[in-house]
Amino acid sequence: MRFDEVGLFWNDSKPIKTRKEKIVRTPPDPVWLSPDYLPFYDEAKDWEPECMTNEELVDAKNRGDRLVWDTESYPNYWSAGFTNVRTGRCLIFENSPEFGLDFDKSKLDWVLRNFTLVDFNGESYDRHTAAIAIKPGTDASHMYQATQQIIEFGTPGWMVVQNFKARKIKMDHIDLIQLTPLAPSLKIMAGRLASSLMMDLPFKPGTYLTWEQMRIIRWYMFNDNRNTQLVYEAQFENIKLREEFGPKYGVDLRSKSDAQIAEAIFRAEVRKRTGRNPEPIPFTGSFKFKMPDWVQFKTPELQWLRQQLIDADFVVGDNGYVQEPAFCKDLQVPIGGMKYTFGIGGLHSTEKSIAHCIYNAAGERKFILRDHDVASYYPWLILNSGYYPPAIGPAFIPIFQEIFDRRQKEKKIDKKGVWALGLKIVLNGTFGKTSDPYSVMYYPPLMVQTTISGQLALFMMIERAYLAGMEVTSANTDGVIIKCPVERDADLKAIVKDWEAATGLEMEPNDYVATFSRDVNSYIAVDSKYKAKRKGWYKENGCNGRPDNEQIKKNPTAEIVGDALEAFFTRGTPIGESLRNCHDINKFVTVKQAQGGGVFVEPGSPPIYLGKAVRFYASAGSKGEIITVKKGHLVGGSEGCRPIMRYDGQFPTDVDYEHYANMVEEHLELLGFNTLTQ
């Protein structure tokens, strides 16, 4: 039944989805579990790290050099490896009573206490096994017991150290794992950052290692150090910002995510102002959304939505998260020729495979295509709500107001300055913590008040444009793109000004020449200077030689396709020219997670185990594919691929240019290019 039979909305019945069958192969025999499986042994057997002398070590300490480090733990082998970020010289500590390996515990203790160390998940794991390693009388078996307790049983590391009656080490270290959203594995990060070698742990945890396997593990450990250094270098500006901003509040922010920074600073401010150390306060039951007075609509559809939100009960589940009201499920709000999804997660338009351009077929400019982003959107809505997290108390409002005002002031002085960037992190991170049940910022009514008010404000803008006869081509959580005849520029500006007066918010406009949208989250927009803005699938990733905090959030997926599309849209470069003129293999690779581990299989060749993170490119000479080792599921996009876990500095001669050209053609259609040329 259609929604519009009983009300003002409709929800067209969706086509029946046919379940897409997973392509399943029979996994090969797991030769990689055999005792004689020795990957990279020829290199590892005689390899020795270039170690620092004691004099060099003291000099490095006096210079303030930083060391990246890692540990490896097996029942009969434990090691810790350190690499000087500045010089590349190393330290290694190994223990295996079975093979007569031991180390100077006092020296390891000195290193741990006298350097700034850089690690990946060191706060949860490495620092604790190292604390046990320096305790007199411990050996590899004890460190492995600790490893099992931390990793397999989930016991907090500090508790494991206590159980072993070991001494907690006072360490100065930077844990990189929290600096990238969703905390991807080091192996995935290596793929995003064009590591020369992506290598998974070569031997199953719990294996009693042979001498040959130990040589491989130590070689592998220093490859992990190289990859950790890649992440450190990619995050250097973020770390530098945290180092400069943290002391202003007396807080160490170096290992914290953006949201964690917001919480740490609020904790510090509350302690300073009230003497309290706030703790999370749970929220149970339900609550109502408080409709802002400024939210007003003229169309019956949006008036209906407004009333539904006034009447709705927002229920907090047993897990502490807000449940979507029933009326929001599958809701699509029609305004003009567009439908919009609406809910706690945000507002999104539903366009598919559509392009817009300001010129007609004769090359005459006929339209304005203007993107309007809301400035300081959620921070302003948080302040306007008047709500505060109970754990923080009323002090939240003046603290947040001061941070907001200081940010506005500093942004005018130096938008890239420490204060401006640091306060931006605090403002944006605050909202994320309002929905976290384990945070002192937790308060579901504040989260809902912020996100729903924001969506209603955007609906007010969309409605105004629609009633004025203009077209909204796209809208998401914090902005809208409006298309109108070029002679109506003044009308559009008047609409925006009227909206700003009604809501108290401010729009930041940006004009486009054209937009090409696969959907609301994946598109390429060309601005008035013919520079491209790429989002979603088309967004650049960390393999482009300019890694930053945005680009390392995304796995590489044949980035050459997005590059070729950008060159075609902005400069008219032929697709084939873009493909064949690129000699950077990073632009052609795809990096993916392979559940449980991936293996490359090709008729007539032995299987090659790749690991849980795989990297490959389309090969004109390959008949192989990558499948998961347990269930034989095909890793998507790997048919006819060639794995390239290691770079040798040479561009492959078998790149399948036809495959990539077909991908570009497919995405031209997905981006709606043919809607411009029809």
Language-model segments: residues:
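Conserved DEDDh/DEDDy metal-dependent 3′-5′ exonuclease domain
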Residues: 66, 77-79, 85-188, 220
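Acidic, Mg2+-coordinating catalytic module of metal-dependent nucleases/exonucleases
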Residues: 118, 177-269, 285-288, 477-480
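Helical catalytic core of nucleic-acid polymerases
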Residues: 171, 177-186, 194-212, 329-461, ...
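Two-metal-ion RNase H-like nuclease active-site motif
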Residues: 64-73, 174-175, 370-372
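N-terminal accessory regions of nucleic-acid-interacting proteins
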Residues: 2-69
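Acidic catalytic cores of enzymes that act on phosphate-bearing nucleotides/polynucleotides
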Residues: 233-368
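Short beta-strand-to-loop capping motifs
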Residues: 481-487
